[in-house]
Amino acid sequence: LGGWIATRAGGHFATGETHIDDLVESVRALTPTGEWQSRRLPGSGAGPSPDRLMIGSEGALGVITEAWMRVRPRPKYKATATIGFDEFSAAATGAVRAIAQARLGASNCRLIDPLEAKTTMAGDGTKALLLLGFESADCPVGTLLDQGVRIAEQHGGKVLSSRVSEPDFEAGDKKGTGGGSQWKDSFLLAPYLRDTFVACGVLSETFETAITWDRFEEFHADVMSTARRVVAEVCGVSPDGEGAPRISCRLTHVYPDGAAPYFTVLAPARRGGEVEQWDEIKAAVSEALIEGGGTITHHHAVGRDHRPWYDLQRPDAFARSLGAVKAELDPAGLLNPGVLVGP
C-alpha cells in the first residue's frame, strides 16, 4: 500500500475512482526533519493538499508509515461482455469515448488492438476487442452492461460474448465465447515473463501514457510509427513482414476527456547488446510520447527510467518549488537521491 501511494499509481478500475489519489483520506510520513501528518477528513478545500504533495513523491520527501484509506465492499454482482470492432482507433474515439462520457462507471473498459488480441490468444487478430465490465456490491449491473453494449453497437461493435453473475448462482448467465479471460491470464503473467523473454532472445518493453480524445488518433499513429521504425532500426530487422517487431496497443483506462494508451514492444534481441537496445528504444518512444503532448507515465511512476522526460513535462516553476520542498524536508538529500528532483 505504501508503494502504491508513493508512486501515485492507478488501480485496475478502467473508469471513475481508480488512482490512489482518490482513495487516500490521510497520510503519515517520516522525513529527516520530522513527522508529516495530515488531518483525516472526508474532503477539504483548505488550500493545496498536504496529502497530494506526499502522494507520488516516490520516497524523495519522506517514508510513508501510515495511511487512512477509503475502501469499497467486495462486489457481489458482475456483468461483462467482449465486443469486436473492425478498427482500433475508430473504436477508441467512437465507442469507448462515448461509453466514458456516458459516465456509466464501468470497472473494465479495455480496448485491445488486433495484434495484442492475437498475441495474448484473446482473438484471431482480425478484430479489436473491447472488454467491458461492471460490478457492484449492492445491486445487479446487467442494465448498465446493456447500456454500454448498446453504445458500442451504435459505433459498429459486435458482441462476441457476455456474462452476468449474481450471488445466487456461481456461473451466471453466459452467452457465447470471448477472449476476456484469455487476455486477463496473459496480462497477469506478462511481468513475470520479461526476463524469460530476454533469455530467449526477445526484447519486451511497455510504454504507458495518457492523451486527450481530440489528439488521440494522431498521437496513436505517430507513436506506433515511431516505435516500428526505431525498433526495426535498433534490432536490424524489417519494420514489416515476417520477423518484424510486434508493436501493439491497448487502452487501460478511459476518461470523459481522454484515454490512457499502453504500448507493448516485442522484438528480436541482440545477444550481449540487450541493454543498449533497450536504452535506444526507451529514449525514442519516450520522446515521441512527450512531443505528442502525452504524459511520460500514467500509472507506472517516474523513478529513474522516466526522469529525463518528466523534467521536460513539468513546468519549470513547479520543478523549482518541488526542489524547495525537498530541501526543507530532506536538506542532506538522503532520501532516494536523483528521483523527481536533484541531479
PLM regions: where:
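FAD-binding subdomain of flavoenzyme oxidoreductases
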Residues: 1-110
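Short hydrophobic alpha-helical segments that form membrane-spanning helices or hydrophobic packing faces
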Residues: 10, 65-67, 219-220, 307, ...
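A short, flexible low-complexity segment enriched in Lys/Arg and Gly/Pro that occurs
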Residues: 25-44, 269-280, 304-313
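Acidic/polar loop patches that form or flank catalytic/metal-binding clefts of enzymes
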Residues: 36-37, 106-108, 158-161, 297, ...
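C-terminal substrate-recognition/cap domain of FAD-linked oxidoreductases
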Residues: 73, 79-87, 92-284, 288, ...
